[in-house]
């Protein structure tokens, strides 16, 4: 079910869920801009604007209700997402002058795990005919009907004992969900290559008249630009197994060319400032550091980003 915490009834219901015995796991996916500390958020806000402040309220209500700690799975594409989220919560504990017992509860009874999701999910289905056909086929109305690629991997950083707590192994998803002690190699590969490719070419492609990712893969200039960026400017900066990187990059074109996924460029462009900083800037800076010159494609990508946000672009 979905709750709207910006409505009084929805906020109250959210707090009831926070204190429920059934609640064991919270998953967050609030984009690169989501895990941010906002000092303007107050304990009395219903709800506060930032996600970490909302989470602090939820955990505090759960603590005051005498319920056990939860497992927090952060999916945002930032470094150390679980740890950064915990840092924000601890800052709100200090700002709101909450008791030491709650701070101990958050840091010892709750488990903040970093994680990495690798699956292209372009958004809800908009075609009325397709929606009607799916509803007829399955026999029910789904107001949150979405579409995603078949490929999917979720890497969770944590102790092996998480496999006994989380339901994925029992659900037969051992080939798609991995619990590992260090997810940084998986994250760097995915963020720099797959996400970096998306953010690296979509703004320029949109300015050139394209609307969906698949169309770009059918354009020799666009696809050539993406491949040159990946193989000449991104992969050489990654201190990981080169065969693995080349194999992963090779699959990117096929995934972007999925005939069943209409991934809109404007959807990917959301929060491009934080995305370019997280996905492309590290490759840009490391290339300059190693080669002593500007990377041609990444520099053009940066120029397209500036042009995209220019007042001259409609």
Regions found by a protein language model. Give the residues of each.
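Substrate/ligand-engaging "lid" and interaction regions
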Residues: 1-314
